[in-house]
Amino acid sequence: ILAKQYLFRFTKFYFSHLISLFKINTNNIVNKPKKNHQIFINMVKENQLSRENINTYNLIKKNKFYNELIKINIDEKFFNDLEAIILFIGYSRSGHSLVGSLLDAHPEILISHELHFMKHLLSGVTANNIAESIVINSAIFNKNGREYTGYDYSIDGQYQGKVKRLRVLGDKKGNGTIRIIRKYPEVLTLLDKFNVPVKFIHVIRNPYDNIATRAKRNNTSLRFAAKGYFKNMEVITRITQNTTFEVQHVLLEDLIYKPEATLNSLITSLDLERPTENYLNACKGRLFSKPKETRFDYSWDPMLVNFISKKIKHYEFLKRFQHRPF
């Protein structure tokens, strides 16, 4: 079932990508390059294949009115103050999009939405090309609101898609990043190309809710989703044990119930100053009142609950959930 879903989505995205390229070429031929702006926005926001294709961003950079579209001047000095790269790691449906959007609203941080940083790094794309593509993705993804999978991630009055001064650059592709590292662990050595520290952010949701939501969204069994969840946890443990990298664990329920303390801790862990009250209040306005408890949508096999309960005990960063009743 899952393979059929992926094949259907790929086919849909592939033909949409080809149609977009045809329209772009046509507009260029008739000397109407500005008409391509909405096409670029749709490619980045609505088509996963286009969004994760580095050539999409190269094409955008060639547009005559490129600066007017992204409203950021990426000159030779733009990256001079860059101090860190951040990458999200974890499991899908855990709150990465929310945390990525909150960070992107900070005046010194730009976060791309699912550019798939690690894939491009592995394929030999230059550090400069990846960095520029992150900026373009962030700028375009915030056009006409920052909506994704039915949720609105816009933070009113803040700096999503723009910066005062760029100090931290990152990509939100938690599950995809882990898949690449699991299959090609040597990719971690390629991060040296950026000449700044690389830090990982691991957003943690209640494992049962996370597994249930993934099973629901992908129409798979709870057992299949649980096995995938703990495969990712194994990779995260290896990254945590690698002293080359800092890993910041962010509990989604802490973000919801203690937003100021959690955001202060996260921002300062990136060696930035404590965020302003205006920023914190804007971020709090985007948070849910409580975490979604998707686990109660299912009737669980006691053997599976026992399996998950035992696996949770293997991971220090999941210790909060070790003795919590289901």
Give each language-model segment a name.
Residues I1-L87, S92, A215, M233, ...:
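PAPS-dependent sulfotransferases, especially Golgi type II membrane carbohydrate sulfotransferases
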Residues S92, S101, H113-L115, H202-I204:
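Glycine-rich, histidine-containing beta strand-loop boundary motifs that form or position
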Residues S97-I109:
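A conserved segment at the C-terminal end of the G1
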Residues H106-H113, L270-R274:
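A generic secondary-structure signal for well-formed alpha-helical elements
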Residues L110-F194, F321:
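PAPS-dependent sulfation machinery
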Residues L115-M118, I204-N206, Y279-N281:
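A short, structured active-site edge motif that brings together acidic residues
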Residues A131-I140, S221-A226, F296-M303:
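A polyampholytic, Gly/Pro-enriched intrinsically disordered region
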Residues K162-E277:
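PAPS-dependent sulfotransferase catalytic domain
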